[in-house]
Amino acid sequence: MFVGVNKENKMQIRNSTLADFDEIFRLYAAASAYQTTKNVTIWPQFDENLVKTEIHEHRQWKVVIENTTACVWATTFEDPFIWEEKNADPAVYIHRIATNPVFRGQNFVVAILDWAKEYAVQNDKKFVRLDTIGDNTKLIEHYQKCGFTFLGTSHLTNISQLPAHYSSGNAKLFEYIL
C-alpha cells in the first residue's frame, strides 16, 4: 500500500476498503449523471465484483479531505485490450477517475498524476497512462494541462473484453513518461 499526504489542503491518498464500496458506486453514478449533461460517452454500471477485486488487491484508491471521499480511481499494471503491444511497457494504468461533485474543479488529476509518479517509481514502472472514450475535447485538453501527453486515438480490436462504454472501439490514449 502506498499513501500520499498533501499537508496544504489536508488531502490524503489511500487505498479504498470494502467500507467505501457504496461511496465508490455513488461517485460512479454521479460521474455518469455529469457525463449525461455534457453529451459525451456515458459510463455504464460497472461490475461490482471488479471493484471488490480491485479493493482486495489494493488497486482501488481514494482522495480523502477532512474525512470525506473527494475522488476515487483504480490502477493496474496491465491493460492489454486498450494498450495492445504497448502493454509490454512497464506502466501504471489509471482507470475510472470519479470526483465527488462537492469537490469538482479541484484538479485531482494533477494530484493523482503526482501520486502515480511516485507509485510508479516504487513499482519499477516507467510510464503512467490513462485513456478516455469518445471525443470529449475538454477532457482531452484537461488531461494535457495536467501533464499527460496525448498519444492519439487507438482503434481497439478486442472490445468484447472491455466495459460497454468502449463499444465505439476508439480510445484516446495519454501517457506520462518518468
Please place each PLM-identified region on the residue numbering:
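Short, Lys/Arg-enriched N-terminal segments with co-localized hydrophobic residues
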Residues: 2-10
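A short beta-loop-alpha structural element at the N-terminal edge
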Residues: 12-26
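Acetyl-CoA-dependent GNAT
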Residues: 18, 29-102, 110-115, 177-178
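A conserved short alpha-helix in the GNAT/GCN5 acetyltransferase fold that borders
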Residues: 104, 113-121, 144
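Conserved GNAT acetyl-CoA-binding A-motif
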Residues: 120-132
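C-terminal "cap" of GNAT-fold acetyltransferases
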Residues: 133-135, 146, 156-178
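Conserved acetyl-CoA-binding loop of GNAT-fold acetyltransferases
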Residues: 143-153
